[in-house]
Regions:
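A glycine/serine/threonine-rich, flexible loop-to-helix segment
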Residues: 173, 187-215
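Conserved glycine-rich Rossmann-like NAD(P)H-binding loop of the short-chain dehydrogenase/reductase
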Residues: 30-46
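Alpha-helical segment proximal to the catalytic Tyr-Lys
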Residues: 125, 169-170, 240
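Conserved glycine-rich cofactor-binding loop
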Residues: 9, 16-18
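Short, small/polar-rich loop/turn modules that mediate ligand/substrate recognition or access, typified
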Residues: 172, 177, 242-244
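Catalytic Tyr-X3-Lys loop
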Residues: 91, 98-118, 132, 136, ...
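Catalytic loop of short-chain dehydrogenase/reductase
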Residues: 136-159, 164-173, 185-186
Length: 257
């Protein structure tokens, strides 16, 4: 399928690794010029090299901490107008309502929840002026499959699902589409490190980590590309009637009791 994205511009937060990097790479393969953010400049430089070695697009790196006050406004001023915003940065730690202290809770929400909100506010206004744009929020399936052991993540993700649905329900009036994506278990570097540690503990052999995920749908984790391809599709006019919804990519795990 031809997505007709060549020459467009996208900003992907958390774009140096994992799903964010995957989204940047897939969009670049479609001819989209890329802006990526991360808190680590070296990671951004490595991601840029991988993309520009493979595709003839412009990749601009923006080292920044989107949890900082005023960071979204500053980033938007640096990047300028774009066609697609992919909010992806941020990871919320495990923990119960008792074990997670307020400082940790607030810090994680400052990056993921407020990071998404603040950049959406900045770019929604810009996109509305030109009556065109797509905002994709890469959230997480815990927002719909809640866990008391992941209380901050469940609540934070649920709030971003509400943002995507509420804003996207009326955004057509401004020529904008807003969509959420909820990845389930996905084979990112970060997740593989976690599974390898569990395999080392259980089997004494980190290389056996795949044995621990056979209980997932299809006997495996999802791949980064399976999420990244959806990001690219949602950005395209091929998905031009899609807004105000959240698409779950978890192999059906959310429906398993």
């Amino acid at each position: 399928m031809e997505l007709n994205l060549k020459g467009k511009t996208a900003l992907i937060t958390g774009g140096s690794r994992g799903i964010g990097f995957g989204a940047a790479r897939v969009l670049a393969s479609e001819g989209v010029n890329i802006h990526i953010t991360s808190r680590t400049a070296a990671d951004l430089d490595a991601a840029k090299k991988k993309i520009t070695d493979a595709y003839k697009v412009t990749v601009t790196c923006h080292p920044c901490d989107l949890a900082a006050e005023g960071a979204a406004e500053k980033l938007a001023a640096e990047v300028g107008d774009i066609d697609f915003l992919v909010n992806n940065a941020g990871a919320i730690p495990q923990g119960t309502v008792v074990s997670l202290d307020e400082k940790t809770w607030r810090k994680s929400w400052d990056l993921k929840v407020w990071g998404f909100i603040n950049l959406t506010r900045e770019y929604y206004a810009r996109m509305a002026k030109k009556k065109s744009g797509v905002i994709v929020n890469v959230i997480g399936a815990a927002g719909e499959r809640h866990s008391s052991g992941y209380i901050a993540g469940s609540m934070g993700n649920a709030s971003l699902m509400a943002l995507s649905r509420a804003l996207g329900a009326d955004s057509h009036k401004d020529g904008i589409r807003v969509i959420g994506i909820n990845p389930g278990g996905t084979e990112t570097d970060r997740q593989v490190v976690r599974w390898r540690a569990l395999a080392e503990k259980q089997f004494g052999n980190a290389e056996r980590w795949r044995e621990l995920v056979t209980g997932f749908p299809f006997g495996r984790l999802g791949t980064v590309d399976e999420v990244a391809n959806m990001v690219a599709f949602l950005c395209s006019d091929a998905s031009g009637y899609t807004t105000g919804c959240v698409i779950t990519i978890d192999g059906g795990a959310s429906h398993i009791k």
